[in-house]
Regions:
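Short, catalytically relevant binding-site loops at active-site mouths
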Residues: 37-39, 54-55, 89-91
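A glycine-rich, hydrophobic loop/mini-helix early in the fold
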Residues: 19-51
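Nudix hydrolase/Nudix homology domain
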Residues: 8, 44, 85-169
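Short gly/pro-enriched beta-turn/loop segments at secondary-structure junctions
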Residues: 17, 78-79, 102-104
Length: 169
């Protein structure tokens, strides 16, 4: 629409917006963040390594790099992110008694590096903790509807296809 709105307004009105998602991958494992219990959506659930809205005037890769730095303290460069593709999503739900309409186009990236989670600097307002999990175990949990995860199966399949055989650690 060309309209600049807040994150809250985008989700209350279902306005189409851009996001940047970064999956941190090390062999057959992916890094998941446990969202802060104070988040306005999906509180306390396991999620993508790093993700966020693209601010007005920002580009996709710059937003992905910003979110990595803000949420996890990772200073990456654009050549370290590998573009996996775009993912369109719409979710209609409710959190804290308020409608939540997530209407997004996500730019999905892979960051294939060994990350020492003990050295990460977590943005506690966003991220409670991080864990490494086996890619295929996460995929199995998501496919079975495990409510501990707020991850879309089709995005995991994008990442599986993108990294190919590198995910069987």
């Amino acid at each position: 629409t060309g309209e600049t709105v807040t994150r809250a307004e985008a989700h209350s009105r279902g306005i189409l917006h851009r996001t940047a998602h970064v999956w941190i991958i090390d062999g057959g494992n992916i890094l998941l963040q446990k969202r802060s219990k104070t988040k306005d959506s999906y509180p306390g659930l396991l999620d993508i390594s790093s993700a966020g809205h693209v601010d007005a005037g920002d580009d996709l890769i710059g937003s992905a790099l910003r979110e990595l730095k803000e949420e996890l303290g990772i200073s990456a460069s654009s050549d370290e992110l590998e573009f996996a593709g775009f993912r369109r999503a719409f979710y209609r739900g409710e959190f804290y008694g308020k409608p939540f309409l997530d209407n997004e186009i996500a730019a999905v990236y892979a960051y294939r590096k060994a990350v020492d989670i003990k050295k990460l600097v977590l943005q506690t307002s966003e991220v409670e903790s991080v864990i490494w999990e086996d890619f295929y175990e996460v995929l199995s949990h998501v496919r079975s509807g495990d409510k501990r995860y707020c991850i879309y199966e089709d995005e995991l399949l994008m990442i599986e296809k993108f990294v190919g055989g590198n995910c069987r650690g």
